[in-house]
Structure formats: C-alpha cells, structure tokens
Amino acid sequence: MNRAEAEQKARALVAQMTLEEKASQLKFDAPAIPRLGIPAYNWWNEALHGVARAGTATVFPQAIGLAAMFDEDLMEEIADCIATEGRAKYNAQSKKEDRDIYKGLTFWSPNVNIFRDPRWGRGHETYGEDPYLTSRLGVRFVRGLQGTGEIAGSGHPYLKSAACAKHFAVHSGPEALRHEFDAVASPKDMEETYLPAFEACVKEGDVEAVMGAYNRTNGEVCCGSPKLQEILRGKWGFQGHFVSDCWAVRDFHEHHHVTSRPEESVKLALENGTDVNCGCTYERVMNALHEGILDEAYVTRSCERLFTTRYLLGMFDETEYDAIPYSAVECDRHLDAAARAARESVVLLKNDGILPIEETVRTIGVIGPNANSRKALIGNYHGTSSRYVTVLEGIQDFVADRHGLAGDEKVRVFYSEGCDLFRENVEDLSAPGSHDRIAEALTVAEQSEVVILVVGLDETLEGEEGDTGNSYASGDKNDLLLPESQRILMEKVLDCGRPVIVINMSGSSIDLSAAQEKAAAILQAWYPGARGGANIAEILFGAVSPSGKLPVTFYRNEDLDAMPAFTDYAMKDRTYRYFTGTPLYPFGYGLTYGDCKAQISGTEILKSSEGEKAETGQGAFGSADPGQSAVGSDFAGVRISITAQNEGRETDDVLQIYVKDLESPCAVPGPQLAGFRRIHLGGGEERTYEIDLPARAFTSVDEAGIRAIRGKKFCIYAGFQQPGARSEELTGASCAAVEIEV
C-alpha cells in the first residue's frame, strides 16, 4: 500500500467519525471505536536498542555503543531484528486484545539529537556528536525498523513498523530545565549541526514520524512551532505524523507560559502540526472546539495523518508480517546480531601489550562496581533479557571454556566489588570513611597476575530527567569524573604493583587521565547489551580484535572550563569540529590488535547526469544563489580510492574519510567526517576500496544558514582515525592526505 492509497483510506474512514471520535484519536492512548471496527491503539512504544518496556526482548548495546561500531549495514540489520520482535510481540498480544502501552508498532526511536556537551545525561541515547555519522546511522536505523532498507528488499506493501526521529529539533540538555528552556541556536549552527540528521531521516529514510522536543527553539515551543513545521514539511517534504514528547504540550501553559491554559495549548499545538499528544492536554480538544478557538479542520487533518500511518502498517488488513511468530523474540539470529554489535562497539583506548591476555596467565583479579552489574550492561530504554552475562561472568565462562576446570589447567578468577557505584561504602553499617571494600580489592589484586578493573556509570547516574538516581543533576553529569568512591578505588588499584586493565562502562565521555597514565590497557565498553560481558571477554582474551571507534570526544575534566555554559547552544569549543584544546581521546579514535594503514591511491571528480543537479541540500534557511557556488551545478562529489594494508593480526577496522575546506571562511575550522566504511583484513592482507563523497561533503554554511560549495580547494584525509596531532600521538600513525580542486 503506497501513501496515496493509505491517505485515501484514512480520509474515508475519518469522514465516518463524529467530532468526539476524531478528537479521541489524537491522544497517545487512543480508544476503540467499535462501530467502525477500530481497535484501541497506544502510540507510545520504545525501541532505542531493542523493544523496550514490553517484556522479553533482545537487548542490543545502547545507542552510543551502536554508533561506536561505525557500521551502517549492521545498524540496519539490528533495526530489522527489533522490528521483527516488535511484530512478533504485537501479533501475539493483539490476539489476546492486549493493546496497552509499549505493545504497538509505532516506535519512538531513533534519537538523532547531537551529543554536543559531554555532561548531557541522555547523550548515550544518541549516535554521538557528529552530524554526518548521526545522519548515516539514523537513516539506516529508520529503514531497518520500517522494512524499507536493503535487508528487507523491495516489494513490501506495508511498513514493518513505524520509526520516529526525535527530539526535533535543538535538544540536548540541561535535563533539569527542559520543560521551560529556550534553546537559542544561530542559523549556522542549526543548518550545520542540529538539523542535518533530521533532514536525512526525512528525505532519505522516509521516516514515518517525528517527535517534537520539550524545550523552545529560538523562542517557539518545539511542539507548536510554525518555523520548525515549515522546515519539516515545507522545506523537506515530511508527510508522516508529528508527536509531542510526553506532557510537552502541558508545558506550554505550566512552564513556558506561551499560553495561559490547556485549551490555548491545544490550539497552538494542533494548528502547528502536533498530531498526537503524548500526555493529557488533548483531553481538552472538545473544549477548544466548543469555545470556537480551534477549527475542526485541524482535528480532521491530524486524525487523517494518524490513520494513514495505521493503514501503512496494515492494521486493518492482512499482511505478510502477521505470520511472524513469537519464537522470533530472542531468536538465534537476533542474539548473534547483538553479539556482533557488542564486539564491534568496544573501543580500545590504550594497550601497552597486555592485551590480549596470554593463555599462560593463571590468576586474574576482577574488581569494580560494574564488574558484576547487570545495570551496566543495558543503559536506559531497554527490554528484559532472558539471560544476562556480566563482565565477571563473561570472564569466568571464557576461561572455563578455554582451560576447563580440572588439574593444573585451572585458571582462578578472584572477584571484589571494590566499592559502591557512587556511595562511600557498600554496606550501610560500615564505618563512615572506611571505604569498606578497598582492603578486599587490594587483597584480590595481590593474588592476581593480571587485574581487570571495571568502573563507570549506569542509567541511575546518567540519563533522563525523572528517571535517574542522580537527582542533584536531574540525569546530567556535573563533571566528567568518575564518582569519588571509584576514583579512590582506581588510585589504590593502579598502585598495587600488578598490570591493570581498566574497563570503563559509561555512555559518555569520562576523564580517564589517571588510567591513561598508569593502566596497562583501557577499554571503553559503553553499555554493551544484556550478554555483552561475554563479548568483552572475547576481546580481553583475543578471540576477537577490538575495532570500535569513539563517536564522541573524550575530554579532560578541566576542558569544561573552556566550553560555553551548558545552556549555551553555540558550537564554539564543542565537539571535535570546534574544540580548540587537546582531547584526551579524539573522536574517531580506537585501537585494534591489527596494524592497519591506508594510502590514497586515486581520486575522481564525479559529475551528475545531464539535466540533473547534484544534491547538496537545499538547507532549512534557503538555497544559495548561483553566484555563491564555486563549482558548476553538475559537480556530484569525489570518488576516492584507498589501499588498506594490515601488517598485524586479523581484525576489523574502520576507514574514515575527512574533508577540510582550504578556502571558505564559513567552513568548520578543521577536517570533518565525510565518509566511513567498516572493513575486515587478515594478517598481511591488502585491499583497495572505493568510497564516494557526495557534493554535500564539500559544502559550508554561512552565518545566515545558507549551505553552498564556496571553496574549490580541499584536502581529503583517509585513515583509521581522525587526522590530527593527538590521534598520531596515540596511534603512531598518520592519515594519508591529498589536495584536490573541484
């Protein structure tokens, strides 16, 4: 069923409804209309990294870990797995007339906001700090969820599920202020940073839904903004439905004070495109109609949009997806995809040669509050796994499988929690200031040839306002330090005289300076999924090479002093594109057990077909005048040939292409990501790859928000990390570079 057919059916159905019935369908928990054969439907469903809050499901790595894979194909496969499980659960529950919250097919994922500030608690729900990476992964996630990508193939008449790009448009903290805050962003920052991922999801992913944010953007509430709707529907041609974040419309009159009462909020939201209200304010739709402040046409329009989505999902027809059985939930294919994702997501930040751990090691100490923590596996917005494997359990299982448990071959794994995640003591009755697990931790270290220290955060310390235990910051972080209890533990363990491997499990940048100075190795494991501990163990012992790359910059804590205030949405000194200091670990960085190098073996200027104009992006703030472009309208991009060679062990790695504009004063100061590809090379293997960089990669954005190709000379960099002195210092390798004129 195409959209035109779905719209026609929706109009015919809505035409049969009474005014009260139409109004009732605009709430997230839409009631049944039995006389028309319409069952109840709840629009609120979550699928950030697996079907969430709906019982058993495959729990994939948290979104920030999925971003660290730099793997578009696996991202789409994971989203397809999620959609399959969503359909399986929907099929089973619908037959039992269970149509409650979290049990539908409209998934409010992905989160394509930009992780602009490392303090933001919800940053681990995103794909990191780079607009290009976020765009590419967001598009593939949308296609996977909706069944419209390469994995699903062509010819499917219905959506497998409906994705939702959120939170439109300028939203990344502070969490404590989100219900009242006005995010002020310049046209340049909007077009260059905050809008591209949404634009890509709409224009390339054909995303079925977009969610408006809680905050205001440049003075207008995001769920009642004429300017944002003009960009979304007018400039980009969005045709799906628009949903408010939960209780965001109530914020209009209670916190933003742009209206004075619920009926006025209903009017502002509906007239400006918010079709479904997650919250209670649309219970006043009939009041607004009776008062004469709202035209029925807006109610009808939104109702038709919502039923268009339901028809596209096949909710009133028989579809091929009806046959998906419940046995698809946590099936072998999905668990395998989760395992591959966990392996690809782990980032090796340092290795003095201790990794992989030698088979001759017979005593291993595992220490730390996240070593045996299930919470540290799953992040937020998660489902429930039928089995969890913590880091400790993964290590125990791996050595048992490799060595057995008998005779001289036995490997002893000692364990100590070491400290609480953030409290001073583990036991409530321990003496204040005693740090009651430190002595045990040091004893374990003394007994061990190698120590694995597992630290970090979990969803109780970084997350969404109202959902975390970190109430003093409403989910955001005050700084980039580990909790004091963990810093004390780390200091003691790093000085224990044994080689220490630090595993940090967090969804954001943590200042690991102490570990960088003294640890033998460091792994950034994110929140790796329900069974991720098994995959971390595979990396520790060399069954798999680490190959993840940082989707965010890792700063030192003092770097926060140079950044704008958290409430300042200017991009100055934020992210790798504008940060002027020296990061602890740069965006795009990550070591492997291999030794991969890249050379640029050729470039080719691409031209568009006769009569076609290359897509550089119209831009939310208008198109460039022909005189602003430094190239002809037929310029379609650059094809770059890269020869990659691995002089070490077999490994995956990620080819990264960066472009620097050498002429335009509007360009970002340094090179920015323009292409990437995950590759696999055996030991000693050499292969050549071709990567096409679109014309948009050569654009810059001026202060008016106009995107154009203003320069003719560019430098293209190719390698396995971001170009720059810090990357070279950490990896011992530099990117290949070539200057071109387009």
Task: List each model region and its residues.
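Glycoside hydrolase catalytic-domain context in secreted enzymes
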Residues: 1-609, 616-617, 621-627, 632-704, ...
